[in-house]
């Protein structure tokens, strides 16, 4: 098995994505005249200094998520670049109608930045769980979806998302990989090469996947951007292995990107195993994110069992 070239670890002061977002976005407010932050109370502490420096560039509407989307939509129609932030459940699910009407219907863009999906905020239990956020975003056309696995990637992808007028969803997590990898547009990053199949690891799942497959002769692809889906990269990886086995490991609902895999490989007979947050259960326990990873089979040991069984 040959290892692919990966990015050398960068010197980065932030150990979590939330802090990286606040620092990076505060810096962007100083240099980008179009950028404006819209909040629903959560995350306001990240922008105290920025709000004092320019109150018109940090707008906190209080716990009114529908209003937050309306304000952001209006700003976008005026030529600004709104960055909208709160907990994932309150960013994507609660104001879904306003997202559709204020952005998709008006054909304007924004950067929606979430925190806490799928079950990072386990201390608040089921009301704050959002394993279906990517599925919700997928129901609307023309969204770019970033799922970083490291604070440095989160910062890089945020800065990449600010220019232009596209619709972007940036999913921040408390779970992180040990090292960042280079953000290469929408292309998947090869981590290592093998012959028995291809494992696509999304965002913070990578370290567990690497541990689970350390003794397996498989190709590992890493995705920090999952929409648009890198069909070309996946096809090339599958064509290069001896067995067309594909394992998809996502930190949200299992099978969320299965249709993308099938469409990408429509001309290539293949087998697919989709791993992620289980759809057949609603786990309402508190616990920790690691506990929930184990329940849903996303810890390294469970992944190893599932992948080994699939490969045979």
UniProtKB/Swiss-Prot annotation:
Keyword Signal found: yes
Pfam family name, one: Transket_pyr
Keywords carried by this UniProt record: Plasmid, Signal
Residues spanning the signal sequence: 1-28
Alphabetized GO MF terms: magnesium ion binding
Alphabetical list of InterPro entries matching this protein: PDH/Transketolase, THDP-binding, Transketo_C/PFOR_II, Transketolase-like_Pyr-bd
Stated induction or repression of this protein's expression: During the interaction with host plants.
PANTHER family: PYRUVATE DEHYDROGENASE E1 COMPONENT, TRANSKETOLASE-LIKE PYRIMIDINE-BINDING DOMAIN-CONTAINING PROTEIN
Function: The FAS-operon encodes genes involved in cytokinin production and in host plant fasciation (leafy gall).
Protein's UniProt name: Uncharacterized 33.6 kDa protein in fasciation locus
Organism for this UniProt entry: Rhodococcoides fascians (Rhodococcus fascians)
């Amino acid at each position: 098995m040959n290892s692919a070239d990966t990015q050398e670890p960068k010197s980065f002061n932030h150990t979590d994505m939330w802090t990286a977002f606040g620092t990076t976005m505060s810096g962007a407010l100083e240099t980008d005249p179009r950028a404006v932050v819209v909040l629903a109370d959560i995350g306001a502490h990240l922008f105290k200094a920025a709000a004092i420096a320019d109150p018109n560039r940090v707008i906190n509407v209080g716990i009114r998520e529908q209003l937050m989307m309306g304000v952001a939509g209006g700003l976008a129609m005026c030529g600004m670049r709104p960055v909208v932030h709160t907990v994932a459940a309150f960013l994507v699910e609660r104001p879904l109608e306003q997202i559709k009407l204020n952005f998709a219907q008006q054909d304007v863009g924004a950067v929606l930045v979430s925190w806490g999906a799928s079950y990072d905020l386990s201390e608040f239990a089921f009301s704050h769980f959002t394993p279906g956020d990517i599925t919700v975003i997928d129901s609307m056309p023309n969204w770019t979806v970033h799922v970083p696995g490291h604070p440095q990637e989160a910062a890089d992808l945020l800065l990449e998302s600010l220019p232009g007028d596209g619709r972007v969803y940036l999913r921040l997590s408390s779970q992180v990989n040990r090292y960042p990898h280079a953000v290469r547009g929408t292309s998947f990053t090869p981590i290592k090469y093998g012959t028995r199949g291809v494992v696509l690891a999304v965002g913070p799942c990578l370290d567990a996947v690497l541990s689970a497959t350390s003794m397996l002769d498989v190709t590992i692809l890493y995705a920090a951007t999952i929409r648009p889906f890198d069909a070309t990269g996946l096809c090339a990886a599958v064509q290069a292995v001896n067995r067309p086995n594909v394992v998809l490991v996502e930190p949200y609902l299992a099978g969320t990107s299965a249709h993308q895999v099938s469409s990408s490989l429509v001309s290539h007979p293949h087998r697919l195993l989709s791993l992620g947050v289980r759809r057949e259960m609603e786990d309402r326990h508190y616990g920790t994110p690691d506990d929930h990873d184990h329940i849903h089979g996303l810890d390294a040991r469970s992944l190893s069992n599932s992948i080994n069984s699939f490969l045979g």
